[in-house]
UniProtKB/Swiss-Prot annotation:
Name of the protein described by the UniProt record: Alpha-aminoadipic semialdehyde synthase
Coiled-coil residues: none
Any one GO cellular component localisation term in the record: cytoplasm
Protein purpose: Bifunctional enzyme that catalyzes the first two steps in lysine degradation. The N-terminal and the C-terminal contain lysine-oxoglutarate reductase and saccharopine dehydrogenase activity, respectively. Negatively regulates free Lys accumulation in seeds.
A Pfam family: Sacchrp_dh_NADP
PTM: Phosphorylation of Ser-458 seems important for the LKR activity.
UniProt keywords, alphabetically: Cytoplasm, Multifunctional enzyme, NAD, NADP, Oxidoreductase, Phosphoprotein
UniProt family annotation: In the N-terminal section; belongs to the AlaDH/PNT family.
Pathway linked to the protein: Amino-acid degradation; L-lysine degradation via saccharopine pathway; glutaryl-CoA from L-lysine: step 1/6; Amino-acid degradation; L-lysine degradation via saccharopine pathway; glutaryl-CoA from L-lysine: step 2/6
Binding site residues for L-saccharopine: 703-704, 730, 830, 852-854
Organism annotation: Arabidopsis thaliana
Binding site for NADP(+): 729-731
Catalytic reaction equation(s): L-saccharopine + NADP(+) + H2O = L-lysine + 2-oxoglutarate + NADPH + H(+); L-saccharopine + NAD(+) + H2O = (S)-2-amino-6-oxohexanoate + L-glutamate + NADH + H(+)
Length: 1064
């Protein structure tokens, strides 16, 4: 070891403690030690506390600000290099791990969780000692450091907050409406006081009879449930036994003769249920037995939906659950109950067990948007509270809402033994409960956790081709399937089981592993165990049976802590008929950019393995091959958080941070894949293309092929790669539809006389609810500037030039023949003549026109606003003075330039309209422009933001604010081609049309815009065609070749993006 290594090694046990700034989650405000804990540790002296210094990384969001730590003697610094022990709450970023240090945090690695193995690898490679809070267990067998009660407390407060809003939408005003979310209160005491106030109002004013009885059902009896019940008990309440629930619904409903409720209810009801209330034995002669249920859940039927759910208003889910147990409430059960008019209002899933015991809770929610609505009638998810369905909450970081109290509780316990960790130089120095919590020591796994590599190596997902040296059990003469359930990992029973197998001379292979997701949850594993001698296999079974059923002959060191359940099954033998092994071709795609377009592209590529077995896929890519294509997708973004959010819920997609200006990082990731799909701004494509040429990787973009990229054609060709550009919607699908129509005409010996194309990204009719009938899905500046570009096209042989300032005035009414309900207009889109060259029709077509679509009336209003000066991008004198003015004052400045009194206020539509008329516009035009100006808020007496230096800036600011899509609104894409074909021999003229109409959709709570789909999916199809080697042309190309556009259009249709074609 070099001298620097010796210096690093000396840090361990030096008594200097570091506290990390939490960076993984924006809401994480907890801290392992509060200033008061630090004060006691520092002022107690190193001889007594084991701590000489505490260095705190600065954090503006931590619940206790830096100055409070500094006041008690802590040092504030980003540099923790002097620290031998570093504390956090959640896992730190990998680059924050310093070598030869001790770390303590919740690592979530001891069950070999796949997603956290890179963290463990980093820990081991940096020779770090890791103590996991989750594994610090007291003599009673329970965790010492946990936040369960705080999750329960915050969870129920948050749900009551949402319950008030939901009831109001359903037509009932309740005291819950005044309650805020947990994080809105300065302390737990303040939140409790607010709940008490709600309770007092219920006790004195009552609740509407129409929502009563209001029954809260709590699952489980652990700390989470106790915390939630603690909040519930602040309300006037009565607890009811599960068997008594039906009685609440048969009492006098208090309905008068005219059918109106005449009574109020002055309390709420609670019911605590455990597993015995959720299931019953399949054998009617047998009663519920908890031990039997945990060992053999298959012997029991679920009954919660029959006995409890019909009487539940709010289900507060606090219990652990495993996949081998029946669902508490399935989607089908909820749908059946809904038809019967059940009273279920909402699910408060504090466990945040996604797709777990409550099947339809399909995603975690955020503290600042904690709710979603599931409508079982149409199996749809919504982000609002309006409409039918069940309100669901599943926040996974609830304790941080009471960060002050949670941190105090945590630090009270941690400060009792942090000194031992800070002064530890040898693991043997630690007390037993801390020693058992150390997953690694100086970069080596401790003996209790040596099973982790074994689990990783035998996990088919992680190492399908790298089974451990013992060999797969199916290679042995005698084989069995052993099912183990219990606290296999946190109680280290898995070590004993694997040791027994190996000690007897057997082998094992992990066939299945389902990890318990909480301290109380059990884990479940299936091991294929093999031996070449039947007696050896019998010995293994006997040993495992004794481990599962300890007695005087065999006492497990952990017998008191837990038992495991054991089942023996059959493994397919060598002489049995086996299915032909599936052959898979592995490919990789790197997607650069994590914007809206990325998700549908990533989703398509990640689903290739599934769709490659479908008939249409075999048709396009070859039915003879037995191989399935499996595409591993890497999504790279400058901000890792964006990439992670974009790919959430898509399997086999990896999110990474990548700055394309960092050539080393770009080379690293491009080298790992077969195709790069760049969804970055066009200005970034050249640098990406050069890297692809260097590494001989194909590239796909959805952007126009610019001059810089075109110049790379020969280099790309020499490298044997394809750079496929313009593979989106416009450009993209428009090219492909056009080339198919034109090529079909030429094959039939026809001559294209006229080619016209119209395309627009629009709000759906329901979302076109403003004077412009238009909305922006991103900053409107680009769209407005596009409306000022000059245009050129050919009409009946004449070349028509349109100046940018007259573009909106040139708009003409337009109707799609097959879609007459859409009242549209179009204006020319830049230079249409270049498309005559691209499509090979420049000499034969007398009309070549490409237009942009908008709803009718848009252009007249935009032209008027432009003439009035609302799009003036030069610095405005009033805005540049530094004096803050209101939008109303700015409006007066714009419209009163030529008036005698420039400061004349313009309050309403009528006054604004009159002023516009005075400026030379017609009455109709003025009225519509005035309506738009008022809608945008230009007449409001609020200050113009200081960042607005021009009227154009102010207009864009208001348009972005007022013309944005709300959560449930759909956008729409409409693309329409018309081609007139003349057949010289027959002297007939045919008109061919092709139309694409696509709407955005909401699926599993995720909104995907039509624009994102129609740009992202074609780009992904381009990548797939290159992966499957269906594009043979090399160099820079557009989708103008039949080898691209024919399969691409067919795949688009097979994937659900429909094209309507017609000939007359």
């Amino acid at each position: 070891m070099n001298s620097n290594g010796h210096e690093e090694e000396k840090k361990l046990g030096n008594g200097v403690v570091g506290i990390l700034a939490e960076t993984v989650n924006k809401w994480e405000r907890r801290t392992p030690l509060t200033p008061s804990h630090c004060a006691r540790l520092l002022h107690g002296g190193k001889d007594r506390t084991g701590i000489s210094r505490i260095v705190v990384q600065p954090s503006a969001k931590r619940i206790h600000h830096d100055a409070l730590y500094e006041d008690v003697g802590c040092e504030i610094s980003d540099d923790l290099s002097d620290c031998g022990l570093i504390l956090g709450i959640k896992q730190p970023e990998l680059e924050m791990i310093l070598p030869e240090r001790a770390y303590a945090f919740f690592s979530h690695t001891h069950k070999a969780q796949k997603e956290n193995m890179p963290l463990l690898d980093k820990i081991l490679s940096e020779r770090v000692t890791l103590c996991d809070y989750e594994l610090i267990v007291g003599d009673h067998g329970k965790r010492l450091l946990a936040f369960g009660k705080y999750a329960g407390r915050a969870g129920l407060v948050d749900f009551l907050h949402g319950l008030g809003q939901r009831k109001l939408i359903l037509g009932y005003s309740t005291p819950f409406l005044s309650l805020g979310a947990s994080y809105m209160y300065s302390s737990l005491a303040a939140a409790k006081a607010a709940v008490i106030s709600v309770g007092e109002e219920i006790a004195s004013q009552g609740l509407p009879l129409g929502i009563c009885p209001l029954v809260f059902v709590f699952t489980g009896t652990g700390n989470v449930s106790l915390g939630a019940q603690e909040i519930f008990k602040l309300l006037p309440h009565t607890f009811v036994e599960p068997s008594k629930l039906p009685e609440l619904f048969v009492k006098d409903k208090g309905i008068s003769q005219n059918g109106i409720s005449t009574k109020r209810v002055y309390q709420v009801y609670g019911c605590i249920i455990t597993s015995q209330d959720m299931v019953e034995h399949k054998d009617p002669s047998k009663s519920f037995d908890k031990a039997d249920y945990y060992a053999h859940p298959e012997h029991y039927n679920p009954v919660f939906h029959e006995k409890i759910s019909p009487y539940t208003s709010v289900l507060v889910n606090c219990m652990y659950w495993e996949k081998r147990f029946p669902c508490l409430l399935s989607t089908k059960q909820l749908q059946d109950l809904t038809k019967k008019g059940l009273p279920l209002v909402g699910i408060c899933d504090i466990t945040c067990d996604i797709g777990g015991s409550i099947e339809f809770v399909n995603r975690a929610t955020l503290i600042d948007s904690p709710f979603f609505r599931f409508n079982p009638s149409n199996n749809s998810y919504y982000d609002d509270m309006d409409g039918d369905g069940v309100l669901c909450m599943a926040v996974d970081i609830l304790p941080t809402e009471f960060a002050k109290e949670a941190s105090q509780h945590f630090g009270d316990i941690l400060s009792g033994f942090v000194g031992s960790l800070a002064s530890m130089t040898e693991i043997s120095d630690l007390p037993a409960h801390l020693k058992r919590a150390c997953i690694s020591y100086r970069g080596e796994l401790t003996s209790l956790y040596e099973y982790i590599p074994r689990m990783r190596k035998s996990n088919p997902e992680e190492a399908q081709d790298n089974i451990i040296a013992n060999g797969v059990s199916s290679q042995r003469t005698f084989n069995i399937l052993v099912s183990l359930s219990g606290h296999l990992f946190d109680k280290f029973l898995i070590n004993e089981a694997l040791d027994m197998i190996e000690a007897a001379g057997g082998s094992f292979h992990l066939a299945k592993c389902e990890l318990g997701q909480s301290a109380d949850a059990e884990s479940y594993s299936e091991l294929e165990v093999g031996a070449d001698d039947k007696r050896v296999l019998d010995q293994i079974i006997d040993s495992l049976t004794r481990l599962a059923n300890p007695n005087e002959d065999y006492i497990s060191p952990h017998r008191e802590a837990n038992k495991i359940s054991l089942k023996i099954g059959k493994v397919q033998q060598e002489n049995e008929i086996k299915e032909k092994p599936e052959m898979t071709k592995k490919s990789g795609v790197l997607i650069l950019g994590a914007g809206r377009v990325c998700r549908p592209a990533a989703d398509f590529l990640a689903s290739v393995r599934t769709i490659s077995s479908q008939q249409w896929y075999k048709t396009y890519f070859g039915a003879d091959s037995e191989e399935k294509t499996d595409v591993h997708v890497i999504v790279a973004s400058l901000y890792l958080k964006d990439a992670k959010e974009t790919v959430e819920g898509i399997s086999d997609v990896e999110a990474v941070r990548l700055d394309v200006s960092d050539s080393e990082s770009l080379l690293k990731y491009v080298s790992q894949v077969d195709v790069v799909l760049s969804l970055l701004p066009a200005s970034c494509h050249a640098v990406v293309a050069k890297t692809c040429i260097e590494l001989k990787k194909h590239l796909v973009t959805a952007s126009y092929v610019d001059d810089e990229t075109s110049m790379l054609h020969e280099k790309a060709k020499s490298a044997g790669i394809t750079i496929l550009g313009e593979m989106g919607l416009d450009p993209g699908i428009d090219h492909m539809m056009a080339m198919k129509m034109i090529n079909d005409a030429h094959i039939k010996k026809g001559k294209v006389k006229s080619f016209t194309s119209y395309c627009g990204g629009l709000p759906s009719p329901a979302a076109a609810n403003n004077p412009l009938a238009y909305k922006f899905s991103w900053n409107p500046a680009g769209a407005i500037r596009a409306g000022q570009n000059p245009a050129k096209y050919k009409s009946n042989g004449d070349i028509i030039h349109v100046d940018g300032k007259n573009l909106y005035d040139s708009a003409a009414r337009f109707r799609v023949p097959n879609l007459p309900a859409f009242a549209l207009e179009c204006f020319p889109n830049r230079d249409s003549l270049v498309y005559g060259e691209h499509y090979g029709i420049e000499s034969e077509a007398t009309t070549i026109f490409r237009g942009t679509l908008r709803y009718e009336g848009f252009s007249m209003i935009m032209a008027t606003l432009s003439k009035l000066g609302f799009f003036d991008s030069e610095a405005n004198q009033v805005l540049s003075t530094g004096k803050r003015i209101t939008f109303g004052a700015l409006l007066s400045n714009i419209l009163n330039k030529d008036a005698d009194n420039e400061s004349e206020p313009l309050a309403g539509e009528e006054e604004i309209s009159k002023r516009i008329i005075k400026l030379g516009h017609s009455k109709e035009t003025a009225a519509k422009a005035a309506k738009t100006i008022v809608f945008l808020g230009f007449n409001e007496e609020r200050e113009v933001p200081s960042l607005c230096k021009s009227v154009f800036d102010a207009t864009c600011y208001l348009m972005e604010e007022k013309l944005a899509y709300s959560g449930n609104e759909q956008d729409m894409v409409l693309l329409h081609h018309e081609v007139e074909v003349e057949f010289l021999e027959s002297k007939r003229i045919e008109k061919h049309t092709a139309t694409l109409l696509e709407f955005g959709d909401i699926k599993n709570g995720q909104t995907t815009t039509a624009m994102a789909k129609t740009v992202g999916i074609p780009a992904a199809i381009g990548a797939l065609l290159l992966i499957e080697d269906k594009i043979k042309t090399r160099g820079v190309l557009r989708p103008l070749e039949a080898e691209v556009y024919l399969p691409a259009l067919d795949i688009l249709q097979a994937y659900g993006i429909k094209l309507m074609e017609k000939a007359e």
